[in-house]
Every structure is written in structure tokens, then in C-alpha cells.
Amino acid sequence: MAKGVRIIVTLECTECRSNSNKRSPGVSRYTTTKNRRNTTSRLELKKFCTHCNKHTNHKEIK
């Protein structure tokens, strides 16, 4: 069987990684799927971070 085109990726908050003084400890992570053929670069979306308590950029991690 052929490998599927869609893969599951994890998005991590960029501000939580670099900022230590925030509302609560931890790093916000989301999982989503992306099409490997259409989006070859790393995915970056604005999502709500519960630790920062605001909308921030979330980048794809390995």
C-alpha cells in the first residue's frame, strides 16, 4: 500500500519556549494534519495559548 499524503504534525507555542514569566508553567501544543505535497515547509499558525493567555504563533516541531 502507498503511504498517505496527509501527516500528523505538532504545533508548539513560540513565546512559551522563550518566555519564562507567564501565567502558568508549561508549553502549549496542538496537533493537526497537513498535506505533505502542498505544504512542504514547516507549518506556522496563530492559535490560542492557554499558558500565555493570548493568541500566539505556533510552529511545527518534529
Curated annotation (Swiss-Prot):
InterPro entries: Ribosomal_bL33, Ribosomal_bL33_CS, Ribosomal_bL33_sf, Ribosomal_zn-bd. GO terms for cellular component: cytoplasm; ribonucleoprotein complex; ribosome. GO terms for molecular function: structural constituent of ribosome. Keywords: Ribonucleoprotein, Ribosomal protein. It comes from the Bacteria. SUPFAM superfamilies: Zn-binding ribosomal proteins (SSF57829). One of its GO terms (biological process) is translation. Pfam families: Ribosomal_L33. NCBIfam families: PRK00504.1, PRK00595.1, rpmG_bact. PANTHER family: 50S RIBOSOMAL PROTEIN L33, CHLOROPLASTIC, LARGE RIBOSOMAL SUBUNIT PROTEIN BL33C. Belongs to the bacterial ribosomal protein bL33 family. This is Large ribosomal subunit protein bL33. It comes from Acaryochloris marina (strain MBIC 11017).
